[in-house]
Amino acid sequence: MKKLYILFLILILLSFSTTGCSAEKYGAGIDKNIPLVKVKDVFLDNSLQGKMVTLEGVISTQCQSSGCWFFLSDGTGRVFINLAPKGFTLPPKTGKKAKVTGEVMRDQHNVQIIAHGVEIY
């Protein structure tokens, strides 16, 4: 009986170690069918204008008042992520890893991502 109890306890501990933490989702979440690109790509590849992309990086700066925007950095650059057009906000998450799915928008000199969904992990 003692061996059965120990085996049961080991199985429970193993199940906890394999489940991992789930991501916090905001907006529509991440669309797994949309390609993952680097931040530098949204600046250098003009064909991405108006297209949906997914980015992954760290939240380097964030709106202090309402959480309606942030900058995402991935080692290749930093891009402005705008949450306001889709009507959602993010609680303080500066320094956290994030994935963003959104539309690449650019004007003459600026590039931004209109976020449709964000996951923090």
Language-model segments: which ranges?
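Positively charged n-region of N-terminal signal peptides that target proteins for export
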Residues: 1-4
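Bacterial N-terminal signal peptides
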Residues: 8-17
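OB-fold and OB-like single-stranded nucleic-acid-recognition modules
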Residues: 20-121
